[in-house]
Regions:
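Non-cytosolic head/periplasmic domains of membrane-anchored proteins
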Residues: 87-173
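Extracytoplasmic/periplasmic/luminal assembly and interaction segments
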Residues: 41, 50-101
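Hydrophobic membrane-insertion alpha-helices, especially the h-region
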Residues: 5-25
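Hydrophobic/aromatic side-chain positions at a characteristic register within alpha-helices
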Residues: 22, 29, 34, 41-42, ...
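Short helix-adjacent coil turns
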Residues: 43-48, 138
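Flexible helix-coil transition and linker loops at the boundaries of alpha-helical arrays
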Residues: 20-23, 61-86, 108-120, 156-157
Length: 173
């Protein structure tokens, strides 16, 4: 019985130790991605800050990868990745700031075009916000096209579909 208790205890300690190592490595990667994204954000490179990607570094004379806020969220996407560090929530806030406060309508549409075939969980929100910005700029034809595109591209997402349909109905009144 004593051997069973020691074995179970050892397995539990081993699991906690390995999980802690993996968590810490994810945390360190997240901090790096967050810092890189923040530098891009501060330079006005909102697409790069949001998604990350390869870009040319003139000093190094080569393409380098720069992380984005989305990589921070991806690192902690698994429901078992707990506890989520504060950098996760900061990245969420920065993503919302980019989508709702920083992007112009044309930048939002350009981001959609750039990342449409690439995994990006924020494209539906970007597209809806882009349509709203076109309305603010009195570019109603573009707004209508964007909302219809949102329905066509993300029609299975009920929230996005309903929002786009609502905006189209308001435009057609």
């Amino acid at each position: 019985m004593k051997k069973v208790i020691i074995t179970v205890f050892s397995v539990i300690i081993g699991f906690i130790f390995i999980y802690s190592l993996v968590w810490f490595e994810s945390y360190q990667n997240s901090l790096g991605f967050y810092d890189q994204a923040t530098e891009s954000f501060e330079n006005g490179e909102f697409g790069l800050a949001l998604k990350g990607g390869d870009h040319y570094d003139a000093e190094l004379r080569e393409y380098v990868y720069t992380g984005g806020y989305e990589q921070v969220l991806v690192a902690w996407a698994n429901k078992w990745a707990i506890p989520k560090p504060s950098v996760y929530y900061k990245a969420e806030e920065k993503i919302n700031e980019i989508i709702y406060d920083k992007l112009t309508a044309d930048e939002g549409f350009a981001l959609f075009q750039q990342y449409f075939r690439v995994s990006n969980r924020h494209l539906p929100e970007i597209l809806i916000q882009t349509g709203k910005l076109y309305i603010e700029n009195e570019q109603y034809g573009k707004a209508e096209a964007v909302f219809q595109l949102a329905i066509d591209a993300f029609g299975r997402n009920e929230t996005i579909r309903v929002e786009a349909q609502t905006q189209l109905e308001l435009l057609n009144q």
